[in-house]
Amino acid sequence: LQDTFGMNMVALIDGQPRLCNLKDLISVFLQHRREVVTRRTVFELRKARDRGHVLEGLAIALGNIDDFIRIIRESPTPPVAKAELMTRSWDSKLVREMLTRTRADGGVINADDYRPEGLEKEFGMGQDGLYRLSDTQAQEILQMRLQRLTGLEQDKIVAEYKEVMAVI
């Protein structure tokens, strides 16, 4: 008692339908899975870098909260406040500590590895140790609710930043 049946093993390879044997079909499938995993990983890395960048800005705001509140209060419109936040260089011990962590093997991690793609070099931590806010960070700070200014929230931001950097 033996049953046989035919299979039409056609696959789209480079946009063209092609009849494949089992070996070719498995090879094409594995190549497809590698591409999918690579694209997903790059997407998640980009997303984690963007979130880390926003968290750095929030940490700067929490470290210099009095200056931020004064600038926002004295500005006539949100775009003026945003421009003022972006033009100043900010000193922040907290962000310096967040950016200067060491790897498990003892080497120092390069902060540029965590920069979002397309972010100009003028933003972020400068050679002088001062931090310049980007457009995205300034916008996020202006949209931040006052309840996020508490000490407990600062600990949450630092903890989330560490989690994001561990993912990267």
Task: Label every PLM stretch briefly.
Residues 1-168:
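C-terminal interaction appendages of subunits in large macromolecular complexes
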